[in-house]
Amino acid sequence: MIRRNRQMNRQPLPIIWQRIIFDPLSYIHPQRLQIAPEMIVRPAARAAANELILAAWRLKNGEKECIQNSLTQLWLRQWRRLPQVAYLLGCHKLRADLARQGALLGLPDWAQAFLAMHQGTSLSVCNKAPNHRFLLSVGYAQLNALNEFLPESLAQRFPLLFPPFIEEALKQDAVEMSILLLALQYAQKYPNTVPAFAC
């Protein structure tokens, strides 16, 4: 997965765009679609599975949509890292709750290192220590608040990177761009997957 991220990051943006738009099977979260890998080995079977996903989720095909704005280009380049970025953003936003209740120690090492690197401030918002699902949901909601600046077809596909429970995430204000860029840079330098127990 990490090697695939690096390869995708170097491709021209129109190629990345086409892959995201027409090959959701390459990134859809496994809890959203359970299909045996051997069933989609042949190109025709893979194409049919992608068509089913496009139809089932009523995904637009992105015709005539512009990929020139900087946020869209950032999303395209970092597409596969967005779940890790969301988790980091959730940790950052809830750092006061994590610190106060000793839950920092329960985070993966890479998330602890991210929080140690950036000493921002946050207010306590939880009565109890936030769990991994909640951290992912909060980060997802911060990223999702930026969807209005993305082409509709890309915004439609964004939730597919995450487990289904994410759609119940409460609305959040959009993440500050400086924190987003910091999380993206960190995820690019130290790629990791979101803990399985958060999904």
UniProtKB/Swiss-Prot annotation:
Transmembrane segments: none
Keywords: Virulence
InterPro entries, per database record: T3SS_OrgA/MxiK
The keyword Lipoprotein is annotated on this UniProt entry: no
Pfam families named among the record's database cross-references: OrgA_MxiK
Protein task: Oxygen-regulated protein required for bacterial internalization.
The protein's name in its UniProt record: Oxygen-regulated invasion protein OrgA
Native source organism of the sequence: Salmonella typhimurium (strain SL1344)
The encoding gene: orgA
